Every structure is written in C-alpha cells, then in structure tokens.
Amino acid sequence: MKHRRVGVCSDAGPGSWGRVLSGRWTATGLLATILMAPAGVRGEPYFAVQQGAKCVTCHVNATGGGMRNAYGSTWGQRTLPAQFVETSAAADWTGRLNPYFALGGNLRANASYTDVPNQTSTNEFDVEELRLYLLVDAIPERLSVYVDERVAPGSAVNLEAWGRYWFADQRWYVKAGQMLLPFGLRLEDDSAFVRQASGINFDTPDRGVEIGLETARWSAQLAVTNGTAGGAETDDGKQVSTRAEYVRSGWRAGASFSLNETEVGDRQLAGVFAGLRTGPVAWLAEADYIEDDGFPDGQRSQWAGLLEANWAYRTGHNLKLATEYFEPDEDVDEDEQSRWSLVWEYTPVQFLQLRAGVRVYDGIPQSDLQNRRFAFVQLNGYF
C-alpha cells in the first residue's frame, strides 16, 4: 500500500498549506457527554483542558473533532460566547431532529495575506470549506452511522463515513468505515508541524476498524487501516495506530504510536502529548518522532514539536500563542524549521466566531517559502 507523505513546507497557496494556514478553527468545545445529540464543527483540545473534560464529553467522535453532542452544543452556545442572544425557540439548537437523526454544519470564510521573501505578496478572499454532518442513531446510544462531507469549495469530498457500536456498559466500542486516525492532539490547525509531519490530520482519514475504551479517567483507541489516507489499497500491508490518554481535572497526559507497512518503506511514528490548566491559561504540548523508510535516499528520522498557550482573558475571547519546531532530517545539520503564531479568537454570540492572527516562519535561508509571513482573518459560522 502507499501512504500519504505530507510535506511540512509544500505550498503557500489556499489549496493545501495555505488553506490550513488560514486557521482551521471552530468555536466549539471539546466537552460533552456521550449523549449522541450533536451539532456541527470540529473543536479545539484546549477547550477540554480548560474544562477538565475528555474529547468524548463533547464530541460524537471519541477521539475528538467533527460533530458535537447535546452537551457540547449547549456549552458552545451558553458558555463560550461573550453574549447569548435569546430567541423565540422553545429550546436551544442541538442538531437533534428526533431521537434517531441529527444534523450539523460549518462554514469558514477567510481573508489572508502571504508575504514570501523575494516574491510578490498576495492577499485573497476564500471560502475555506463548507462541511455537513449527519448522524443516524439506529439504536440510540448504542448503534450509530455517521457521515462528514465537505461540500464546498469544489466537488464534494467524504471525510468520514463509519458505523459504531457501543457495548452495553458504554465503556467499549467498535467502529468501522472511513475515519480520522487516533494520534496525538486533535488540533484544529492542520498546518501545525506535528500534524503535517505525522501525516495524521483532518485531511488524511483512512479506511478500517477501530476499537475504543472510555472510562472515567482513560481514553484509548486502536485502529487498523489501509494506510492509504483514504486512497485505493495497493498491497497487503496495513497501518496500526493507537492513542491513550489519562485525564484529570487540571491536567492530562498521553502517548501515541503508529506503524504503516508499505512496499516503498515502513513509516513509524511515536509521540507524547499533554495539557495543563494554570488559572485562565490552558497549555498544550506535543512531541513526535518519525522514522520513514520511504524516501529515495533511504531512511529519515524526524522530530516535530508544539507548545501552545491559550489565555481565556475574558468571556468569548481567547488569545493563542504557539511555538513549533520541525527537524526534517536528523542527519542534516542546520535544516530545522520553526513557526510562531499569535491568534485572537472572538465568539461574540452563539454560532459565530471571528479569528485574526499572524504566523511567522523561520527556516533555512535558501528557502524563501520557509521564511514567509502570513496573516489572516476568518469568519466561522457553525450549527
């Protein structure tokens, strides 16, 4: 089988690197119960750290991202925004149409500016994505079918389509279909070095099966998939990915591992991640080590790291400061890359978030792209 090797510095345009650079973020939390009554949108793991919760508390997906359940939707409306706008509706929107069907969605529109040394700077308006979610609870809280579809821009692309069965004790589940792989922090920003270097992000779902365990303090998953990032299988190898996290009210720590066996060469990932709450600041950290045999010049050993602080200085406001590191080849000296990000996130009312930020890249002098500057403003509407 082939696997998708995602370059950390491949394109500054909106189609891939530039698109995720424009800040793939949503104003929803990683909170919520296993109530399977979702609304749309992917969340940020720092919400979970702030609230002392697990991903499954808020999301249909036990590994985070995608639809939120009833608790997560209510939190995103009543707690997250600076102001809750009262309506004539009898109850808050949760996405639940009836006991068996739920819908959700998300729209992101961007204005961005990119400055690459020795090149003409660019600025553009762009629709990053429109995504729709559908959840069918054939047996509520036990048997579900879930679909996550990107319907714009361009032609429709399926990101997730799976069925899941929870056992009676609500501790174990089994899932099969196309899904996001369990590895590291489920960051909203796919352009983060830890998500690009690992190749496991929102753009690289895969097809296979997953077994999960959820207890009061532990969240763990094991997935066996084709290892083709949703593409056609080409050999008899498979990718095995696993993630385990221990959660306390003020901190959490976890580890991940993935092995993708392919004809062109195996790819092995190992990582650790953590979260810590210190007053109004939620800290996130991740470090990943990659051994990749698929390069033409032989095996490469790589490192990627992230340290992020999120300061909720006022209701509806968050200030994010992140520093990142990427070592593309341990055998090559002085080829490291770094990135600094400062992002302001403002949720004025429910279902609406505004983001504005800058990202500064620092790489080898020979690469203009690795030394670019990027600024963006994003409007995110979600339901």
Region roles according to the model:
Residues 88-94, 136-140, 167-169, 215-217, ...:
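Outer-membrane beta-barrel proteins
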Residues 53-62:
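The canonical Cys-X-X-Cys-His
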Residues 60, 105-111, 147-151, 176-178, ...:
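Transmembrane beta-barrel strands of outer-membrane/channel proteins
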Residues 242-330:
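Detector for outer-membrane/organellar transmembrane beta-barrel domains
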Residues 48, 66-68, 96-227, 236-238, ...:
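Outer membrane beta-barrel
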Residues 54, 346, 371-383:
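Outer-membrane beta-barrel "beta-signal"
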